């Protein structure tokens, strides 16, 4: 991924996060990260979703923290390089939303 990640400023957050909040992403209390839970019809759809996200995350060299049980996938995004939320997280969350919508 080109360029060093920087932690989002208050102004950048005000500009970039409302669309993600509107679709269920939440900022984590006590940690500079965003989180969302996804529910699918079954395990195969949940795993397919994770596979599509994983391929994109690898291309971006920006990987989510996630947890899966059967049809549920919990995702947390934060950028280790800047110890907080960066535009990389916003971009990956937006991609994740597109994948989730296409799989429901």
From Swiss-Prot:
Q: Which residues are recorded as modified (N-acetylalanine)?
A: 2
Name the positions where substrate binds. 61-63, 78-81
Which Enzyme Commission number(s) are on file for it?
Answer: 4.2.1.96
The residues the entry assigns to the signal sequence are none
Question: Got any disulfides in this one, which pairs?
Answer: none
A single Gene Ontology molecular function, please? identical protein binding
Q: Which UniProt keywords apply?
A: Acetylation, Activator, Cytoplasm, Lyase, Nucleus, Tetrahydrobiopterin biosynthesis, Transcription, Transcription regulation
Q: Which GO terms describe its cellular component?
A: cytosol; nucleoplasm
Localization: Cytoplasm; Nucleus
Which reactions does this protein catalyse?
(4aS,6R)-4a-hydroxy-L-erythro-5,6,7,8-tetrahydrobiopterin = (6R)-L-erythro-6,7-dihydrobiopterin + H2O
User: Belongs to which family?
Assistant: Belongs to the pterin-4-alpha-carbinolamine dehydratase family.
Q: What name does the UniProt record give this protein?
A: Pterin-4-alpha-carbinolamine dehydratase
- Organism of origin: Bos taurus (Bovine)
């Amino acid at each position: 991924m080109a360029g060093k990640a920087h932690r989002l400023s208050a102004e950048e957050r005000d500009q970039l996060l409302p669309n993600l909040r509107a679709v269920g992403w939440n900022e984590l209390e006590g940690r500079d990260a965003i989180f969302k839970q996804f529910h699918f019809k079954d395990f195969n759809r949940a795993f397919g979703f994770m596979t599509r996200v994983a391929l994109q995350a690898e291309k971006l060299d920006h990987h989510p923290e996630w947890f899966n049980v059967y049809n549920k996938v919990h995702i947390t995004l934060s950028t280790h390089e800047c110890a907080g939320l960066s535009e990389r997280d916003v971009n990956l969350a937006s991609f994740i939303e597109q994948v989730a919508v296409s799989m429901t």
